Amino acid sequence: MANIKSAIKRIDVTKLETARNKSKKSAIKTFIKKFEAAIEKNDKEDATKLFNLATKKIDQAASKNTISKNSAAKKISRMAKELNKLA
């Protein structure tokens, strides 16, 4: 356990940031799963709507460094490819 006051504060901040990042990553995974389910059903309208929502969440996470920009680009690219196959 840390003895220095600033180290104790950093531990608390890290716990908060970790929880926040886990929540954001979980939300991204949920949107991607919903998008994939819409793709399986061949529902282009729903898939497009979910693609836009997922893209927004992924970009927000990338801008806050929750996930890397390359990881975000890869996720969006894969989803766009699946959406274009549906057309």
Swiss-Prot record:
GO CC terms, sorted: cytosol; small ribosomal subunit
Any one GO molecular-function label of the UniProt entry: structural constituent of ribosome
Example GO biological process: translation
InterPro entries tied to this protein: Ribosomal_bS20 (IPR002583), Ribosomal_bS20_sf (IPR036510)
Superkingdom as given in the UniProt entry: Bacteria
Keywords, ordered alphabetically: Ribonucleoprotein, Ribosomal protein, RNA-binding, rRNA-binding
rRNA-binding recorded as keyword: yes
Functional summary from the UniProt entry: Binds directly to 16S ribosomal RNA.
Entry's family note: Belongs to the bacterial ribosomal protein bS20 family.
Family annotation (PANTHER family): 30S RIBOSOMAL PROTEIN S20 (PTHR33398), SMALL RIBOSOMAL SUBUNIT PROTEIN BS20C (PTHR33398:SF1)
Identification of the protein by name: Small ribosomal subunit protein bS20
Source organism: Finegoldia magna (strain ATCC 29328 / DSM 20472 / WAL 2508) (Peptostreptococcus magnus)
